[in-house]
Amino acid sequence: MKRARWLWLAAVLVLTLVGAGCGGGNEESSGGTGTSGGAKDKVTLQLKWVTQAQFAGYYAAKAEGYYDDEGLDVDIKVGGPDIVPEQVVLGGQAEFGIDWLDNLLATRDQNGDIVNIAQVFARSGMTEVTWKDSGLDSIASLKGKKVGVWLGGNEHKLFAALNKNGIDPQSDVEVVAQPFDMNLFLNREVDAAAAMTYNELAQVLEQENPDTGELYTLDDLNVLKMSEQGTGALEDGVFVRGDWIQDEGNQDIATRFLKASFKGWIFCRDNSDECLQIVLDNGPTLGEGHQNWQLNEINKLIWPNDLGIGVMNPDDFDTTAQIAIDYGVIKNEASSDAYIDTYAKAAVEALKADGADVNGASWQAPTVEVTAGGE
């Protein structure tokens, strides 16, 4: 989840000047598929959150040897509530980071030199959920209601959707600061609650309905997707330091990293059972059932992609940038140099040359059985 990140940014910018020539991995590697003598290029990937299927493609790329095949020795660092990927990358402790696009734009707006090089999630997983028996079956119906949402930057997609439906988030609804769980919703203390399709939505479905003794189902809920409201700002993407990617050798490393990572996501699309086991082998906090649901939902955010996995859609970038400036995430309009699609396109072309399906046009999401407590 996103967290407020302004307090650390000034210090991080100082660290960047110091850490540009040091820090994680083979920071200033140049060229080839490893150094002379066959050594691999060492790089670090900083995840946005803890180990879970949200990052399955990267774990699969490592487990299946795809990074090795590209001459890379990749260290995957888990995230958490006190870890800001932008801070880690700017400080030189990782070459690659994963975060939502509006967080990247916010960091750039404060002169943080980072750039998106691959937009892995092609669509947003952010929703508001309501109970079916409430009759609140649209964003417009939330006027005058208690609406839960995570604050600290997570609220902007919802606020954009409310405004689009003529609802002022400051006066026409009661915004409730929602913890990173669904207890307020399950206890009916809010009329609507924020939920990612791949996480909190499952947390509701994994609970028992006290009226029936059975697990809740989607028939009990209205799921209002921000992507269907036209306010689905882009989420997980890969970013690097701007000065790092200017080096030609690092450009080669970035292309190889993306090729292997994309191949990992293709593996997870086409071999979900094996991919799930790879995630479980890396020790996630939540159980197998929850991870199975999450992997399926994450695949829905990636596939299909007409441009090829990881290639930024300029229109979606513009939507995210507009939401960011409308709601004060950034003060200055985002420029198109906030992302570079060169390396993602090169990785996609290399995979196509190997016969890989980089679009997933024919992929259909399987039906995943919800398990009690996500076990």
What are these regions (language model features)?
Residues 1-9:
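Bacterial N-terminal signal peptides that target proteins for export
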Residues 10-19:
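Bacterial N-terminal signal peptides
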Residues 34-187, 191-198, 218-220, 224-226:
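Short, glycine-/small- and polar/acidic-enriched structural segments
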Residues 60, 126-136, 234-251, 305:
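A bilobed periplasmic-binding-protein/Venus flytrap-type ligand-binding module shared by bacterial periplasmic
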Residues 102, 180-183, 190-285:
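Pocket-lining segment of extracytoplasmic ligand-binding domains
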Residues 318-375:
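Conserved C-terminal helix/tail region of periplasmic/extracytoplasmic solute-binding proteins
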